[in-house]
Amino acid sequence: MSQRSAGPELLRLIDLIAKLPGLGPRSARRVALHLLKRNDTLLKPLAEALAEAGAKIQKCATCGNFDTVQPCAVCQMPGRDDGIICVVEDVPDLWALERGGSFRGRYHVLGGALSAIDGIGPEDLGIASLVARVDAGGVREVILALNATVDGQTTAHYVADLLAGKGVDVTRLAHGVPVGGELDHLDDGTLAAALRSRRGV
């Protein structure tokens, strides 16, 4: 889009929208125009919601979740098992586990995964604060619920090595056949992981 066809305000809006995950310049233009066509019903309420979120939502100092209170609502929930910490890469992973409703322990969000390509090292993640939580005592088990990617597995091994010898069980989520999955539709890596994670019946 040329400078002549759009003013600096619109170009800035498009540029900012294009920084969102999964949106390129063309998609950003479509989103910007859609918002502008619905100025009163969408653009203004969205701008207000973004301003309010920026002012009120913060990262939980305990687990790394996002909320308007400190510590977050999940950390404040009574009846959860303080002795089990489930480590996830990012907040959507925490939300997914909460949505399932089967985990009743505590969480720790790393804020990503180790990545040599992206230049993300241990100091860029919440690994030190996880170790501090374990060192504070009372933790029996740390569950590594990290993504089954190369970076996720690298991070899992790194964290497991750091926690070795600290008197806690370090476990990871099972990998393999999803509920309702058919073997002939699975990739080779998933099948191999399922075979390695087999258990007695």
UniProtKB/Swiss-Prot annotation:
Note one Pfam family from the annotation: RecR_HhH
Gene3D superfamilies, per the entry: 3.40.1360.10, 6.10.250.240, RecR Domain 1
Report whether Membrane shows up as a keyword of the record.
no
**Do you know which PROSITE patterns this protein is assigned to?**
RECR, TOPRIM
Cite the residue ranges of zinc fingers (C4-type).
60-75
The Gene Ontology biological process terms listed for this entry are: DNA recombination; DNA repair
- Spell out the coiled coil positions from the record: none
Q: Which residues form the Toprim domain?
A: 83-178
Task: Indicate whether Zinc-finger appears among the record's keywords.
Answer: yes
Give the molecular function GO annotations: DNA binding; zinc ion binding
Q: Which InterPro entries does UniProt cross-reference here? A: DNA_Rcmb_RecR, Rcmb_RecR, Rcmb_RecR_Znf, TOPRIM_dom, TOPRIM_RecR
Going by the UniProt record, its keywords in alphabetical order are: DNA damage, DNA recombination, DNA repair, Metal-binding, Zinc, Zinc-finger
- Report the sequence similarity comment from the record: Belongs to the RecR family.
| Job description of the protein | May play a role in DNA repair. It seems to be involved in an RecBC-independent recombinational process of DNA repair. It may act with RecF and RecO.
What HAMAP family does this protein map onto?
RecR
Show the NCBIfam families listed in the entry: recR (TIGR00615)
What protein name applies here?
Answer: Recombination protein RecR
Origin species:
Hyphomonas neptunium (strain ATCC 15444)
